[in-house]
Amino acid sequence: MPHYILKKSFYEQSSLTVAGKLLGKKLLFNQHQGIITETEAYIGQDDPAAHSARGYTKRTSVMFGSPGFSYVYFIYGMYYCLNVVTEQEGFPAAVLIRGIVLLSENKPNTIINGPGKLCKILQITKEHNNTDITQKYNFCICNTDINIDNYICTPRIGISKGKEKFWRFVIPDLTFLLNV
């Protein structure tokens, strides 16, 4: 199967569908690449853990925008987090990329767990917010030959509200990815 950049139509699906289907896909950012191993969905204004729960603001405007765009924000005064906008324009939803297996030459097969670590190592910052990742080859997510059948859903991590939702998607055994 050729590896192609995921198109806007991929991100127009429900956030829960996208969060599961992103597992095993390849995140490309400048000279870095990694296989996505963990995601979390944040859906609409009724999701108390979503930034969009407080409505439309300058910060959340990207979440209300076109699917397939990056939503990068700063937390705890020290970390950036990378999300991809999902569903339909006007409905605020995004999927947080929480972990990857790094495939870059200088750190091959390194497990990066945590969205802050991911952005720090890949050097993703606020300047990469609101980028169309369906068009740029140096910042995109591509299809792979990896088929992820066995993932688990758990409660989301690091939130104080909406903990009852099992909207975190994770590959429990990364052993097979360490030889990709």
Curated annotation (Swiss-Prot):
The keyword Transcription regulation does not apply. Keywords: DNA damage, DNA repair, Hydrolase. It comes from the Bacteria. InterPro entries: Formyl_transferase-like_C_sf, MPG, MPG_sf. GO terms for biological process: base-excision repair. This is Putative 3-methyladenine DNA glycosylase. Its EC number is 3.2.2.-. PANTHER family: DNA-3-METHYLADENINE GLYCOSYLASE. One of its GO terms (molecular function) is alkylbase DNA N-glycosylase activity. Belongs to the DNA glycosylase MPG family. Coiled coil: none annotated. Gene3D superfamilies: Methylpurine-DNA glycosylase (MPG). The keyword DNA damage applies. It comes from Ehrlichia chaffeensis (strain ATCC CRL-10679 / Arkansas). It holds the Pfam family Pur_DNA_glyco.
